[in-house]
Structure formats: structure tokens, C-alpha cells
């Protein structure tokens, strides 16, 4: 009793000890940092702010998930666990059969890339603590600054508090892109088909180079790092292993300017991963780490195998497969098939402001940048999406279907201005623009037919009768878990995104509903609001809560051009897949590992809704409210109708041939 009182008193007098954010997580070069001091400073500087309130909300949701997971775990009987262990044993044999130790993968990561480039440009700041960014947000920090606890994605005013002598250098993406291109010239000498994770990292399959030249993976890594330094004057670190997942982990071991080689031997790999903290794995972020550790007692990768029965009992099969693969040291070994781009975007983070002139100026810059990138890649698109992050960290998205395909900065700015105007007045800390629905997609395929051929519906009657609460799943791409930056890359200052290669925490960005006895957990803020139709970024889909009214507080002005159908969806919740694999809108089943297909499926629903709105705006009849596979397709040339099809509006929609799950029955039967 006394111990409990003492602990409670200690927590109230030292509240920062329980305050964990992305800023308090160690990166390379932060090993000797006084973590308690960093926690205290971040806590004191953030307390009472909108960011602080948002972090508290997320912390409460995370604790709720942990308690929910504990409750479910406690309900499992020994017989349940025994049956799930049989599943685990069988799955281990199947996964082991896929182990490939014949490939040699190299992951190369530039050392504090932005900061290193700036130091190269201005040698006077060499050896001094510096950060790229400003007082509102920093993109990265050099190793001298990291010793004080300064790191990427940290507000500059907090970084200045931690390190009073910190030097700020403004972001210059033109410069970083130039040096990135130089490094990639070197990479192509070793693997013409290397995978670029971002501007400053890449994955190379060096199997053939090693075989042809009779060199080991370590020797090739040493040579490549030397070549990068000769070409750019910048240092990099490398990891060599049998697959991409392990290679990425290895590249972080001897940072900066070092390398680590993990031999292609099963026993060596198993020993390596046995004591590896789960947080070291790409795709496992703060939320997943805490759920695994606090709810299931899993701290290391080895324990994922030891407690595999719990994972398969409590998570979706795809998520459990990922965790089990990690515990076995398995990862991607084949070069992923090149896929066509589905969208292209640019965004900027800055100090929260409601100054309309400044916001329009930022929008102008983004339109120019996006147009430049599209012209560079020969792209024209028709769907424009505006993304806003408000001062209170609420994400809002607006989309418009343009009258023609374009890559013109004037066209982009014209429509983006209308979208922004509809949101004003608002205080914003991030603006982003994205173009999707490229003309190539329309010319080369029928959207509806393409979806049917790619997404085969496989129904499991036992799953249909299962309550959502019985299968809490996590979204992630098991094949691409090592193809992304640290989660902080998604909140870096002035990020310039032209691809969707960012993998987020497998739990933190899946705020899907947890259902207990038919009731939604009450603490989720969005549940208390009126229904909002949402268009979400990345691989997100439209989400709908039943028996609520639409929120029209952010709708477009009545004087909007009728031919430009605008959809307004404040983004307050991430994607929603029933049982972790079933689209809530149309019932199509897509495993979490199909990240690109989910993105395309999301874009299809968005485009279809915009098309329906366009049709409805020119028709006197009330448009259908069903958000399912559409009745029309977008094409530059009208498709010829069959002789017996006199009225295209009377055709039987393709979705009528598919059986919907119980969760979607109300949606699809509504007229």
C-alpha cells in the first residue's frame, strides 16, 4: 500500500517521466543523452499546447487499446492457446520454407543527410551543433546537436531549450536533391534496379556483383561507401544481410560512417534477432511497441515466436504472420515489381498561422513545385486533393475532380485556391497538394473492370459471423516493412513527398473502431461527432458511421462551379477495414500486405464518388447514396454499347453479383 502511494506521489511530482513522444526516442548519435532531461524539457515546453492535448488524446487511446488487449488475452483458455499454437507451428514450417539465404542485400543510409549537405556548403558550422529548419520545426540535426537530445521532427524552440548554442539553417531541397542524385549514380553501378527508400537511403541487391567480382558483401559495402564519399564528400552507413528487413537494421548499428555485415547463416540470423528489441523493426512504432510490451509482455523479436499463439489469437493473420516472420528473421529478398505511380504530392510544414496571404503564398509555392514534378515525370492528372493540418492537429482533406487532365501550375493553383477558400478562416500548420487519377490509368484500363480483376473477392462464412471485437488487426505491408523512413520522416519540416514509400506504425495509424458488446469505445473523439464522409491519405478509404447526419460545416460555397464537383472530408480517422481485410464500403477483401492495391482501391472510391457527384449535379433526379462500386467510368473516349443495351443507366451494376458481409448489408440495401 505504501509503495503504491509512494509511486503515485512520485508520478504527480515528476509527470514528465510518463510523457513519451517521438522526441524522446533515441536515434543514432543519441546513445548518451540524458533521457529524463529531454522528457522534462519537452513536457514543460509543450504543456498546455494544442500538440500536448493531441498527445494526451493519443496516449489515452493507446492505454485504452492496451487494456482492451489485456481483457481479450485474459479470456483465452488454455485450450484456445493450445489450438492456436498448432496454427503457429504449422505457419513456422511454411515460413521457414520461404527462407532464402542465397541473396545479399545492402541497405545504405546517408549520415544526417540534410545537415551534412549544409555543412559541406558552409564549412564554418562544422563541429558545431546545428539543425536544418527553424523555430517551428526542424527536419534533421547533426550528430553534435543529437548529443543534447535534439532530433528530427522536433519544434525548434524546444531544440533551442535543449541546446542554447544550436545553429539553424533553412531547408534547401534543391540542394538535397542534387546530392541525392549524385549518390544514386553510385548506387546504379552496383544495382541498376536499386530501391530508393527516400532521398538519403536505398536498398541494393548486390548478389550478382559479389558473384561476378568474387567479393564479399562487406567488401562491396566498403567500396560503395568510399565511392559515395569520393563523389559527394558525404559519409554513409551500410548494412549487409540476407534480406531487406535485416539489412536496414544492420545499417543502424555502426552509424555514423560505419557498416555491419550479418552472415547468411540461419543460426547466425536467429541469434541476431533473438535479443533485438521490437522497436528496431521498420513498421513497429511507439503504439505497437507498447501494446506488444505492456499487453503481451513481448519486448524482443524472439518473444514473438515464443508467444506466437497469443499473436494469432489476438491479431489478424496477416499481422500475426508479419510478427512471426520478424521473429524468424525473414524479410523481402526479391526486388519488388515496379508499379505505376498512383499519385504525386507536395506538402509543407510551418508555424501555425491564420494569415490568409501567407497561406495562399504557400499554396502558390506548392502548386509550382507539384507542377514541376509532374512535368518532370510526364504526368497529367484529373483529381486534386488539398490536405490541411490545423493548429489543433486535425487533418482535413478536400478533393475536386477537374474538367480536364492537367499538370499546369495555374490550373492546380486555381482549383486549390477554391478548396482552401472554403476552409477559411482557419489556423493551419501544414498544407499539402496531391494529384491523382492520371490519364495513363484511364487510357490503359477500365477502372471498374481493373478493380474486379485485381481484387478477387474471397468470402469466409465463419468470418462474416464473427464480431469485429474478436479480430483486432493491424495494417502493414509485410513485404515492404523495410522500405520506409523512420516514422519521424512523416512530420519533418518542409517535407517534399513524391512517393508513398513511408511506412507508419502498424497500430498508431489504424484508429479503427473497437466494438464491445455492440458498443463503440466512447473515448474516440470522432464517435461523438456527427457523421463525416472522409477521404483519407495513403492507403486509407472512405469511412462512415451509421445513424448519424453528415457534417456540412466544411462544404463548398453554393456558388461553386457545378462542373467541378467538390467532396469535403475532414480527416479525423484513418482507414477502416472490417476484420482488417474487408472494405467497409463495397465488401472487397484486400490483405493488409497489398498496400499499393489498397491505395488504388481508395483512389477508385474517391474518383467514383466525384464522378457520381458530377452526374448528380447535372441531373434533376436525386443521386444514389450508395457508396459502392460505381455505375460509370471515366474515359477519354465513350465506350461503345452493345446492341441490346439501349439505356446504359439500366445495366446491372457489377457489385450486384457479389455477396456483401453483414456489416455492409444495410449500406448496400439502402435506396
From Swiss-Prot:
Biased composition (Polar residues): 659-671
Record PANTHER family: DNA POLYMERASE KAPPA (PTHR11076:SF33), DNA REPAIR POLYMERASE UMUC / TRANSFERASE FAMILY MEMBER (PTHR11076)
Biological source species: Arabidopsis thaliana
UBZ3-type zinc finger segments: 576-613
Function: Template-directed low-fidelity DNA polymerase specifically involved in DNA repair. Able to extend primer-terminal mispairs, and to insert nucleotides opposite to a single 7,8-dihydro-8-oxoGuanine (8-oxoG) lesion and moderately extend from the resulting primer end, thus leading to both error-free and error-prone bypass of 8-oxoG DNA lesions. Probably involved in consecutive DNA replication cycles in the absence of mitosis. Binds preferentially template-primer DNA substrates or single-stranded DNA.
Catalytic activity: DNA(n) + a 2'-deoxyribonucleoside 5'-triphosphate = DNA(n+1) + diphosphate
Similarity comment: family membership: Belongs to the DNA polymerase type-Y family.
Name of this protein: DNA polymerase kappa
Keywords of the record: DNA damage, DNA repair, DNA replication, DNA-binding, DNA-directed DNA polymerase, Magnesium, Metal-binding, Mutator protein, Nucleotidyltransferase, Nucleus, Transferase, Zinc, Zinc-finger
Gene designation: POLK
Ranges where the UmuC domain occurs: 105-285
Site description Substrate discrimination, residues in chain: 114
Entry note about domains: The C-terminal region negatively affects catalytic efficiency for correct nucleotide insertion, thus decreasing the fidelity of the enzyme.
